[in-house]
Regions:
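Acidic/histidine-enriched, beta-strand-rich ligand/metal-binding domains
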Residues: 1-70
Length: 70
């Protein structure tokens, strides 16, 4: 999955697959986690948020289970 860079201290990049509704997050420490059944507006919100980390913590961590990829 192609990920786009994010200007953030903790998140390096994020990508989204419309067909599977999978959100991938690459963290600054190199970990990559996948979040399943994520609505497209959640991904768009993350990418446009003034604080991607705050958005991630408020809207993704609380509502979706992560599977570690790397």
């Amino acid at each position: 999955m192609e990920r786009k860079r994010i200007s953030s201290s903790r998140i390096r990049s994020a990508g989204y697959d419309d067909k599977t509704r999978t959100l991938e997050i690459e963290f600054s420490d190199g970990r990559i986690s996948a979040y399943m059944d994520v609505a497209p507006d959640i991904y768009r919100g993350l990418m446009s948020a003034p604080s991607p980390v705050a958005y991630f913590e408020d809207r993704i961590v609380e509502d979706y289970t992560a599977s570690r990829i790397k």
